[in-house]
């Protein structure tokens, strides 16, 4: 793996994928931990080098899409701060750190414990897809059952996991792998195609909403 190439490419993500300031303000990012329970909880793991908890590209875009469709009913929670989105963790055996995996598991568990009536949707971008894969497949069945859909952008474990998340229903997972994005082929070589996923966030939002559409959603106390 060429960590220098990965560093240079991912360092450009903020410039390549700007998000409107108002959208960033809407996105929050720590609303499960700090806010009240909502009928829908969105848990997201950002790409390497992205700042904040949700990042500044696909995470806020999907969060805001859900909030616009389900006004007042969505809490958005990013994985962090133990998940640091550092570059070196991409080279670990599970393509992210044990601390990141455990933190994501804890957030899913917290959503179920704190807000037992909430429905969970989730997502990840780049290294964040590994965080989602490695955490969700380890969750107990009662927590997995609360996760209604997962969207993965530039899935770094796509080849290893055969386009799915192990021990989780394949039909609940939507993988976005752009033509030419070599991270989806089991490498960590990052090229321009890896930075095109903002264009998929509208479809990804609709995918998640499709699993929520027929649920009885009421405002939680």
From Swiss-Prot:
Q: Which domain of life is it from?
A: Eukaryota
An annotated GO BP: carbohydrate catabolic process
Q: Which Pfam families match?
A: Cutinase (PF01083)
Q: Which reaction does it catalyse?
A: cutin + H2O = cutin monomers
Q: List the disulfide bonds.
A: 37-115, 63-76, 177-184
According to the UniProt record, one GO cellular component term is:
extracellular region
Name the residues annotated as catalytic in the UniProt entry.
126, 181, 194
Annotated GO MF terms: cutinase activity
Q: What's its EC?
A: 3.1.1.74
**Its job:** Catalyzes the hydrolysis of complex carboxylic polyesters found in the cell wall of plants. Degrades cutin, a macromolecule that forms the structure of the plant cuticle.
User: What's the name of the protein?
Assistant: Probable cutinase 2
Tell me what organism the protein belongs to.
Answer: Aspergillus oryzae (strain ATCC 42149 / RIB 40) (Yellow koji mold)
């Amino acid at each position: 793996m060429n960590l220098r190439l990965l560093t240079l490419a991912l360092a450009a993500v903020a410039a390549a994928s700007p998000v409107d300031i108002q959208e960033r303000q809407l996105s929050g990012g720590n609303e499960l931990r700090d806010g009240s329970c909502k009928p829908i909880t969105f848990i997201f793991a950002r790409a390497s080098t992205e700042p904040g908890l949700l990042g500044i590209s696909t995470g806020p875009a999907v969060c805001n899409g859900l909030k616009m469709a389900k006004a007042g009913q969505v809490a958005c929670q990013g994985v962090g701060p133990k998940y640091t989105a550092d570059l070196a963790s991409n080279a670990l055996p599970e393509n992210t750190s044990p601390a990141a995996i455990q933190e994501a598991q804890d957030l899913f568990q917290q959503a179920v414990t704190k807000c037992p009536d909430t429905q969970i949707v989730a997502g990840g971008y780049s290294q964040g897809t590994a965080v989602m894969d490695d955490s969700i497949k380890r969750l107990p069945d009662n927590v997995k059952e609360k996760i209604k859909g997962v969207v993965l952008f530039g899935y770094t474990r796509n080849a290893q996991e055969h386009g799915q998340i192990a021990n989780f229903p394949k039909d609940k997972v939507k993988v976005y792998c752009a033509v030419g994005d070599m991270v989806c082929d089991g490498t960590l070589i990052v090229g321009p195609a890896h930075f095109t996923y903002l264009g998929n966030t509208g479809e990804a939002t609709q995918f998640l909403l499709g699993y929520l559409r027929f649920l009885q959603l009421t405002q939680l106390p």
